[in-house]
């Protein structure tokens, strides 16, 4: 007897949210675990009036034999609109003008029921933050609880059985998503930073919320209610919690960055003549190479620690390169899309055909300058330190990145050092609260309109504003869709249901652009629903994006390869 199924769900592969019963019929245990996990993480720290917290958005859970990866979107709150009966808000003028105008600083929604908490949302303000959680039970002796036994101030309740047991025991092999194309994910994420410095608790949010952007609300209430989002032009923050304790090592990449990016030696622009500029640049490169190697090889006892330090430094340099330019020249993350953002270590950063030529030029320049500036003996002495650790490639990648930044006359944007320090404080806060090592990285999304999930969540914020109609929202999205048509997107269909614009009778409005066939089995379609609570009730949003076979278009949420 043939099984009846939803045609859309058959085409969605992993994205089966439209037909959950079909999935649970075959994977009942996995569905139970997934719902249990999502309920647990959603109850850990909900936002309240006096404490910051987070709400879970779209959630994707991947099970592997010895670990489980949880990827979910955390919607950010855009800049507040003006209050009724109040003067209009002060225009934000932060110290981060050099970072470019990407968008307002966002924060998470609070569960408070006041009018201020339900302020309407403006179009481009709604962003996304991608959070990934890794649960690993490889080492039983290192298994720990996510939260300490002391529950003061966490604000979660005991509705999930996972709280009472070690997570590793409840996350054993389910095999729900076991597929050959996911086999590389473990290797891609194996580089994760496992070291962290212990800091004392400090005021974390002053940097993320300047005084001018706090309107006239009490500062303490705003800071306690919100979780900091990423500064402008660093659109997204990736957090990874490693739920197994590791030995920590002390390495400060901020010091290294300050040394080789800041003008330690005389800048070429301050010297007269080409020869003087060349000598100044040579001295600076030589000084930076020696300083970098000394910092990354001192107090080393094993290869693993050396690799951690260099990898940590490379990530910070990537962050700097990201912040210093509005147009990136290399791919910083292999998973192109809005769901997975895991930059690999030095090798993964340069696995881009577009960057191969530049990479070879830098390597050649590195060899010439090292031999000519520092002398054969000095170069060999530095290289031997890494040869002893059997990892000369790490040295090459680190120095190569330094030369790239120096030769392009990069400057640290004003306030960037402050940003790095605040990121470290944020990691420290999370480390102290969860007793787990935490990784925070800043990445960007190149094309949001290739995936249905970010569009659906972005639209779900906008109907809160009574003045925004469905037509205006749809027309704004349609303007950007042609930009991704060349990448394989054929069309988009959007439907909104509910009391739109406060109408007394609920209705459904739909719009489409391009080809969006939902009745063809072999059509590649990405689908995502979303809900939004307004003062007039709950409204729903559905988004379909169709992809071309000839251009090999594909949904971002289903992309796991470079």
From Swiss-Prot:
Localisation per UniProt entry? Mitochondrion
What are its GO cellular component terms? mitochondrion; ribonucleoprotein complex; ribosome
Q: What is this protein called?
A: Small ribosomal subunit protein uS3m
Is Hydrolase among the key words of this record? no
Q: Which organism is it from?
A: Petunia hybrida (Petunia)
Give the SUPFAM superfamilies listed for this entry: Prokaryotic type KH domain (KH-domain type II), Ribosomal protein S3 C-terminal domain
| GO molecular function, a single term | structural constituent of ribosome
The record's principal subcellular location, in a coarse class, is mitochondrion
Query: What domain of life does the UniProt record list for this protein's source?
Result: Eukaryota
Cross-referenced InterPro entries: KH_sf_prok-type (IPR009019), Ribosomal_S3_C_sf (IPR036419), Ribosomal_uS3_C (IPR001351), Ribosomal_uS3_CS (IPR018280), Ribosomal_uS3m_plant (IPR044954)
Q: List the disulfide bonds.
A: none
């Amino acid at each position: 007897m043939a099984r009846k199924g939803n045609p859309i769900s058959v085409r969605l592969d992993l994205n089966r949210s439209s037909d959950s019963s079909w999935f649970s019929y075959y994977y009942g245990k996995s569905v139970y675990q997934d719902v249990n996990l999502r309920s647990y993480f959603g109850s850990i720290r909900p936002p309240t009036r006096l404490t910051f917290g987070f709400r879970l958005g779209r959630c994707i859970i991947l099970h592997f034999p010895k670990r489980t990866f949880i990827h979910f979107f955390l919607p950010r709150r855009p800049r507040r609109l003006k209050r009724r009966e109040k003067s209009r808000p002060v225009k934000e003028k932060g110290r981060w003008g050099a970072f470019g105008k990407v968008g307002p600083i966002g924060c998470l929604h609070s569960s408070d029921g006041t009018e201020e908490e339900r302020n309407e949302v403006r179009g481009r303000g709604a962003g996304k933050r991608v959070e990934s959680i890794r649960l690993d039970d490889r080492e039983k002796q290192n298994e720990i609880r996510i939260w300490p036994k002391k529950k003061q101030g966490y604000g979660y309740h005991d509705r999930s059985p996972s709280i009472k047991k070690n997570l590793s025991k409840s996350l054993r092999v389910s095999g729900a998503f076991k597929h050959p194309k996911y086999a590389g994910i473990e290797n891609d994420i194996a580089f994760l930073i496992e070291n962290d410095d212990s800091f004392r608790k400090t005021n974390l949010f002053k940097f993320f919320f300047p005084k001018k952007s706090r309107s006239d609300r009490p500062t303490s209430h705003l800071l306690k209610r919100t979780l900091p989002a990423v500064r402008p032009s660093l659109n997204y923050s990736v957090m990874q919690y490693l739920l197994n304790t590791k030995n920590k090592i002390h390495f400060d990449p901020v010091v290294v960055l300050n040394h080789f990016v800041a003008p330690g030696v005389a800048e070429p622009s301050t010297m007269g003549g080409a020869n003087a500029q060349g000598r100044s640049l040579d001295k600076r490169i030589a000084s930076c190479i020696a300083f970098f190697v000394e910092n990354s090889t001192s107090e080393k006892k094993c290869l693993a620690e050396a690799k951690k330090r260099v990898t940590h430094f490379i990530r910070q340099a990537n962050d700097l390169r990201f912040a210093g330019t509005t147009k990136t020249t290399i791919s910083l993350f292999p998973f192109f899309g809005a769901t997975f953002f895991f930059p690999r270590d030095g090798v993964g950063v340069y696995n881009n055909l577009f960057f191969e030529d530049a990479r070879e030029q830098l390597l050649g320049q590195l060899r010439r300058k090292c031999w000519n500036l520092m002398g054969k003996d000095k170069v060999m002495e530095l290289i031997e330190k890494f040869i002893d650790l059997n990892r000369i490639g790490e040295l090459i990648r680190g120095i190569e990145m330094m030369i790239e930044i120096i030769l392009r006359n990069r400057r640290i944007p004003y306030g960037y050092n402050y940003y790095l320090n605040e990121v470290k404080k944020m990691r420290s806060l999370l480390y102290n609260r969860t007793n787990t090592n935490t990784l925070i990285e800043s990445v960007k999304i190149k094309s949001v309109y290739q995936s249905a999930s970010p569009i659906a969540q972005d639209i779900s914020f906008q109907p809160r504003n009574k003045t925004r109609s469905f037509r205006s929202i749809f027309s704004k999205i349609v303007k950007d869709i042609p930009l991704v048509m060349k990448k394989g997107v054929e069309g988009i269909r959007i439907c909104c249901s509910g009391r739109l614009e406060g109408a007394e009778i609920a209705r459904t409005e739909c719009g489409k652009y391009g080809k969006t066939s939902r009745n063809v089995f072999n059509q590649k379609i990405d689908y995502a629903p979303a809900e939004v609570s307004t003062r007039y009730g709950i409204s729903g949003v559905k988004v379909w994006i169709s992809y071309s076979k000839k251009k090999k278009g594909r949904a971002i949420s289903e992309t796991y390869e470079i």
